[in-house]
């Protein structure tokens, strides 16, 4: 039998490879245009993203009960099998088949959400529990630091390859690849990701589960109800904690608008006139900036007040939304890419600040479920934003019907995005202002004061 140290080393290695393979998707740099090029409308694309977010929310809580009933390793392996099914659906997806294409995408998004929910937390728990108790926290911090480096590097490589092979112009310039059709190039990133899915499955089998399964005879339904009850109890605790309420509401607003851009990003680059082969270069640049941002925000937590830090994030998001709304196409479209930088800075900063401040205001008995609750509500908010984006697009399509009539599908998609983006900075600004007014009227103080009040018993000297 392996020693505890050997099991810990094996699980750490499996965890690093599992996360890298599971999250490195060759189609991310061309995510939006992939769906649109398969023949979907923008409204259908928005609906599918809403369904994906909803499936994560619905399956997240039952997945905890499944982990307790079946074992964490089995849940991680199941999530890897779901990834294989998810990618097979994409690989054999018919192009432009109308309702059939949408139906297969719908199943794909539900399976993808289930896979995300099943491995969420279970893979981390397999590693954390296997690390010897002495020095566990320090060892876990080192594991997360290694994971960040691995993921940043692989994300850059995968983004560059995925965008390049999707571009018909790029592929046809390569020796031995001339004459490839657009349809063939569209499927290359998907076949590459199918290979990643099988590699993910192989790695998932390497985990060793050191956590004993529940010996209770409770049914899966009873365990699921208990999980939902625990989440509702956490929600009630959050409502009694003003600082936690404000932090989560702020996170929901900021995260949903940032993810809205991340979702439609590849269509924005197409609108600027940038070839798909450069999308990977853009995302790789974003990943590099994200690494540098992590070093800066760590210092900002100790220098600036919480309200100033999150106010800075709001300013970044507004600047990004305002910039993309103007669709500046100078320098062959690259001037417009400059306004994407605020989103990269905002995303990395936001989640670091939220993690720091929520940990500060949450007691140890609620900390884990508060962070889980934050993740669930963020996915729910993202789903709602995508629903409203779909409704906005449908309304714009109806209102500009005569203007859109002579345009082809790609030109129509670009025009609708152009019209929609002009609204976003002002909607975000209005919602942010309403949030500030609500906090001031409801709690009679700002975020910094609420955090200081909440953390006062354990941070009296600060």
Give residue ranges: language-model regions.
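C-terminal transmembrane helical hairpin of 12-TM major facilitator-type secondary transporters
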Residues: 308-354
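Helix-loop junctions on the cytosolic side of multi-pass membrane transporters
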Residues: 171, 182-186, 193-220, 439-453
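Juxtamembrane helix-start motifs in multi-pass secondary transporters
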Residues: 72-78, 189, 306-313
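Substrate-agnostic recognition of the 12-TM MFS/MFS-like secondary transporter fold
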Residues: 14-33, 48-67, 74, 79, ...
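Juxtamembrane intracellular "pre-TM" segments in multi-pass secondary transporters
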Residues: 1-9, 207-249, 457-462
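A membrane-interface helix-boundary motif in multi-pass transporters
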Residues: 166-195, 393-433
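Intrinsic disorder in cytosolic terminal tails and internal cytosolic loops
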Residues: 1-5, 130-131, 440-462
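C-terminal ends and interior cores of transmembrane alpha-helices
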Residues: 81-99, 105, 315-331
């Amino acid at each position: 039998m392996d020693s505890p140290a050997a099991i810990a080393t094996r699980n750490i290695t499996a965890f690093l490879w599992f996360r890298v393979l599971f999250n490195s998707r060759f189609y991310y740099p061309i995510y939006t245009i992939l769906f649109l090029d398969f023949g979907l409308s923008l409204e259908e694309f928005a609906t599918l993203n809403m369904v994906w977010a909803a499936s994560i929310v619905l399956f997240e809580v039952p997945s905890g009960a499944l982990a307790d009933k079946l074992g964490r390793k089995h849940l991680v392996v199941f999530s890897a099998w779901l990834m294989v099914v998810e990618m097979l659906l994409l690989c054999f997806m018919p192009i432009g088949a109308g309702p059939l294409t949408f139906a297969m995408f719908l199943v794909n998004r539900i399976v993808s959400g289930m896979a995300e929910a099943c491995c969420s937390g279970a893979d981390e728990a397999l590693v954390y529990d296997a690390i010897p108790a002495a020095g566990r926290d320090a060892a876990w911090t080192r594991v997360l630091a290694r994971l960040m480096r691995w993921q940043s590097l692989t994300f850059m490589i995968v983004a560059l390859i995925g965008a390049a092979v999707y571009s018909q112009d790029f592929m046809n310039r390569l020796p031995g690849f001339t004459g490839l059709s657009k349809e063939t190039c569209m499927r290359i990133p998907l076949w590459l990701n199918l290979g990643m899915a099988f590699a993910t499955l192989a790695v998932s089998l390497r985990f060793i589960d050191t956590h004993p399964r529940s010996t209770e005879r409770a049914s899966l339904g009873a365990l699921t109800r208990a999980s939902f009850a625990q989440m509702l109890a956490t929600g009630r605790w959050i409502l009694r904690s003003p600082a936690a309420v404000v932090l989560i509401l702020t996170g929901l607003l900021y995260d949903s608008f940032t993810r809205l851009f991340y979702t439609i990003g590849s269509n924005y680059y197409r609108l600027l006139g940038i070839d798909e082969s450069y999308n990977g270069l853009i995302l790789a640049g974003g990943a590099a900036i994200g690494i540098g941002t992590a070093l800066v925000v760590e210092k900002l937590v100790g220098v600036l007040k919480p309200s100033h830090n999150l106010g800075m994030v709001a300013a970044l998001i507004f600047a990004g939304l305002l910039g993309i709304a103007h669709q500046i196409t100078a320098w062959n479209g690259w001037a417009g890419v400059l306004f994407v930088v605020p989103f990269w800075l905002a995303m990395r900063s936001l989640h670091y600040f939220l993690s720091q401040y929520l940990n500060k205001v949450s007691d140890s008995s609620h900390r884990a479920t508060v962070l889980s609750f934050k993740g669930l509500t963020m996915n729910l908010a993202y789903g709602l934003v995508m629903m409203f984006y779909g409704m906005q697009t449908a309304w714009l399509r109806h209102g500009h019907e005569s203007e859109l009539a002579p345009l082809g599908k790609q030109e129509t998609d670009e025009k609708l995005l152009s019209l929609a983006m002009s609204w976003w900075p002002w909607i975000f600004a209005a919602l942010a202002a309403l949030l500030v007014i609500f906090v001031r009227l409801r709690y009679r103080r700002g975020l910094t004061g609420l955090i200081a009040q909440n953390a006062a018993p354990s941070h009296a000297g600060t």
